[in-house]
Amino acid sequence: MHPFKRPLRARLIAERRAVPTDELAAGSEAIVRRTLELPVIAAAKVVTLYQPMKGELAVEPLWRALEARGVTCLFPRVVKGSKVLAFGTADSLRPGVLGIHEPAPGSERALSEIDVFIVPGVGFDESGGRMGHGAGYYDATLAAAPRALRIGACLDRFLLPELPREGHDQPIDLLVTPTRTLRFESRGMLEGPA
């Protein structure tokens, strides 16, 4: 592991947990609005979301808005013995392995069906880098689904100039903050407007 990753991750998680509730709510609302305006979201049929941990952005308004548009929303489930997450429908959400609600087994969809991953992260950088919680689930999952678009979202304070990266770290294609939408060309996934 890169020597700066662990202390940086710990600092970002602590900072995220300390974000005032009103700032988190306002930021989440702005990010949902900006995300719903993206042409890639308008064209998507299947989108993954996540159940937020303390201090993470609220995704329920995005989930409800996407479902109202007829988009299938999937949520991650940890699969014992695998780093690749399974994604299933929300109608069977229940407490899971990491203490986060996840879909019951049997509601999974193939990774190849997913158009867009909305990925969580403790921090992102200005070149499409993402830092997660360190377990590697999203890096393994994104590597297994290279054709799907990857969108990160964070408060502006968690967008850093640069994050330490290793070979297994998977980049994102777009980043949405309350004030900006950043587009990254490293994977060549975006043609036309995002």
Regions found by a protein language model. Give the residues of each.
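Charged helix-capping and loop-helix junction motifs
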Residues: R64, G132-Y138
